[in-house]
């Protein structure tokens, strides 16, 4: 049996290659783990927007999950775009017996250009069925607000939101600060609440760039890869923070809109 760490992404396909399973698999590769995938939706998108979303039939999603489970030793998995309540329930039912080790949930709700990627009625399904399975959840500020109903306006409300997500079942919570509380801030702060109650902040410089398509996918994929390699959570979080900071600060300038991050940048530092 190979000793190469094996990972799984359960997410949508991005025809533009900047987000979704494409971003996840690129990140897995760069971090030295073998990536498998379960496609939940096919999207027609590029740097300018999302033009079509086709959810994958439930039986095909189930078949993909079974195929990966029956042939690979997955030690860490991540969930990205699921899209519908039915898909959420299908995936959650399969994952309830923990076939893929540590589970990272990136609650993908809105594309970089503003297009909704999660149906409104699916939000309650995500809260009910997936949050209790999350070893780590990685919402940005708008996603955290949608999951809790709490308006984030300061550090106190961030802490309240993180605690609420834990009460809903997530063990460890990372609220990403790309959508800053202070638009003039030169720092990007991510707030982390660990299962043991420790609360701390990871900081990085903020870069004035439109090329941030797929940042959430890339961050959670790097975190998943590090956990698959056996890294402690705090170490894995720091690596993911460093990876996405490098990816954002060395843009590829591809496309005519919100371009992708640079998945090669971290390895070239």
What role is predicted for each listed range?
Residues 2-9, 26-112:
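Conserved N-terminal subdomain of the carbohydrate kinase-like
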Residues 55, 234-269:
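Charged C-terminal helix
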Residues 32-36, 198-200, 226-240:
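Phosphate-handling active-site elements
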Residues 120-199:
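Conserved phosphate/ATP/ADP-binding segment of small-molecule kinases
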